[in-house]
Amino acid sequence: MHHVNKYFNQTMVIEALKMSFYKLNPKQLIKNPIMFVVEVGMVLTLILICFPDIFGTSYLSRGYLITIFIILLITILFANFSEAFAEGRGKAQADSLRQAQSNLTARLIEENGAYRIVNATELKAGQNIRVENGETIPADGVVINGLATVDESAITGESAPVIKESGGDFDGVIGGTLVTSDWLEIRVESEAGTSFLDKMIALVEGAERNKTPNEIALFTLLTTLTIIFLVVIVTLYPIASYLHLILPIAMLIALTVCLIPTTIGGLLSAIGIAGMDRVTQFNVLAKSGRAVEVCGDVDVMILDKTGTITYGNRIASEFLPVNQQMLEKLIVAAYMSSIYDDTPEGKSIVRLAKQMYINELPKDIDGTYKPFTAETRMSGIITNEISVFKGAPNSMINLVKQQQGNIPLNIESLCMDVSSKGGTPLIVIENNVMLGVIYLKDVIKDGLVERFTELRKMGIETVMCTGDNALTAATIAKEAGVDRFVAECKPEDKIKVIKDEQAKGHIVAMTGDGTNDAPALAQANIGLAMNSGTISAKEAANLIDLDSNPTKLIEVVKIGKQLLMTRGALTTFSLANDVAKYFAILPALMMSTIPEMTSLNIMHLSSPKSAIISALIFNALIIVALIPIAMKGVKVKGYSIDRIFINNMLIYGLGGLIVPFLGIKLIDMIVQFFV
């Protein structure tokens, strides 16, 4: 979805602030052990405010303790806000989607052709409805009659209306979208609770998102580091006593909060939620957060040619007769074989024939139409006088041979010429006589070459699977820029391709929409099923594209990469922060008792009290500063993995070491006048 910015509004910020206070509940906060430690420290500080000498005599004033308490509270609120804000984006999206389907009625077409107005929630799959200009489509469905423009901006964010008509790839409509011209008759495909909008709303408001294995592993590491720092602080107290250094409990609490990885601890949940939301904004349903995360590890992508690499609607561009005298006969025969063919290819053949034939072609032909099937790989019409068919070269040659017909000497070279150009050849026969070849042109989708180049730099190999012959496949693969191809590939062959790649240790992603794709979708590490596909395909996949656009697999994989890189970059920054804060604060605390520590106080912090307050303020502010990065993710450019690693180490590793020194010093220059 492309209308993300409108969710960054005042209402959402206010709701996130409210949720920040609600999440102060220890039952909520204990899910994040790092921030729970901060809350425990905050409670202990509150006790010290009420009873300053409960843990022994302290030289810290009540005002100083209140300052520490407030900063700790703000730190927790900032961390809660980042998570609530990420959740709020999804909820705002759900509210927007819910408005699109509220209070809708439908014009139901009765069996006698009459219309009856009903509530949209009463519609059943299989019923037919009529929607006219200015009306909202009440349910998901397929156009069976009419042609109109439809505004889908409420769903996709795209302002330009799209044309919907029966047949082809543009016959699916989504409930909640607006008809902006003419009228449509639609066969309902979904019932109340199962529509596109319902699925989107269920995703963003559904069950609690479980942590992914990588997230759990990182949480375990961060929790371990927190425990280690707690042990360090606990042992620091007796060491300080031995050195006759007075370290009040409140100062030790503040030091603990500064040293444990609060930055990434406060942002980790938000990073995962924001990653899921970014996938949702592309109208992709992820069955789990793990599916999105695995996308980041994908290094092999299995892509269908038709619909993914090419537009899917192959267009008739030329008639190639076996000899020039046969051209008119070829045009008429191609037209006759396609007049009842509702596929985009068939319609394009009819259009081309009308353009090229100077005489008028018949509008209706009395005969029996034979549709294309996967078994016959041909289609055509049989009348009392003639039979005309078009189809795949192998099928047509075999048919002519079975009926003892003649195979023109140049028919194979004509087919080879078409294949060498990346097109698909269809042979046309009339009464078992080969007339020539129809050149169906495959059109490569715009921008794919650049995207495949970017994926290659990121270490992802692309493999094109196609039913075309090797020559056609090689031409398309070269033009599109994919790394490898598998020609004459049947759906069941994809499983072998996937298993072979997995046996080499690769993480494989693929797309599919049919029942025959289901085993391969289940076998792949990431399976992206089309919403227009079969139920079995959608059940086998772990991602569902509600727009039924196979090319989205590329975007989803990039989002997965971005999620992992964002988590890694901010973890690096957080840990580098902790190291920097350790060397910034400890010398300032110890220099009064251990003069040798003065040389390590490179920032010349004013006093232990100002050093602690400055570090606490910086600790809270850095969480807020990093929220936009957690929400949007770090930029994933078309660099190699090594280049990205080096960039992140320079920006977030080295930056994580330098920024605390500068930040704490600047804050200390102000704080020293108040403590």
From Swiss-Prot:
Active site, UniProt feature: 304
Binding site for ATP: 341, 345, 372-379, 390
Taxonomic superkingdom: Bacteria
Listed transmembrane segments: 34-54, 65-85, 216-236, 245-265, 569-591, 611-631, 644-664
One Gene Ontology term, aspect cellular component: plasma membrane
Database matches in SUPFAM superfamilies: Calcium ATPase, transduction domain A, Calcium ATPase, transmembrane domain M, HAD-like
NCBIfam families: ATPase_P-type (TIGR01494), kdpB (TIGR01497)
Function: Part of the high-affinity ATP-driven potassium transport (or Kdp) system, which catalyzes the hydrolysis of ATP coupled with the electrogenic transport of potassium into the cytoplasm. This subunit is responsible for energy coupling to the transport system and for the release of the potassium ions to the cytoplasm.
Family: Belongs to the cation transport ATPase (P-type) (TC 3.A.3) family. Type IA subfamily.
Name of the protein described by the UniProt record: Potassium-transporting ATPase ATP-binding subunit 2
